[in-house]
Amino acid sequence: MNLPASGQLSDDTSTFSGEVAATCSFEGLADSYLMTYYTGSNQLGGQGDFDVISNVSNLRIEVGPVVVNSEPAPFEGKAINATGKLRQSIDGRWIEKVTSSKSSPGDVAVDISEGSRFRLSAYNWTQDRNGSLMYIPPGNYSYTITITCLL
């Protein structure tokens, strides 16, 4: 007696592929901060704390140049300097990472596994041509600093 041929076994292979993009964002950074005048150091300054949220532990952060929105004219022969500073909280201490100025940005490699809490600050001061600190002129001051994650 002849039996019909048995069915052939078959196999098939499927490949699953995907990608996870590197992400980086800032959480808790306000749109604006008040600056306070410090008479002892003759500086006007403000700061804000924020967290860096990223799926990459080693990344670069750029602190853009300090953009002047408004400031009074400096006293004759003086210059008004402005600085942006980025600090990272590591083991309960604020460690300065990078500084920018009116004319140049700054960028730095950071390891957020050491701490994801950061502080952005802006300061200004006035000095004469010899570098001696002078009183800053009265008036309204406003600066903008942009920070960017460089992945």
Predicted regions and their residues:
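N-terminal small/polar-rich segments of proteins
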Residues: 2-80, 106-151
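Short, surface-exposed beta-strand/strand-loop-strand elements in extracellular ectodomains
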Residues: 76-92
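Extended, solvent-exposed segments with strong compositional bias
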Residues: 91-113
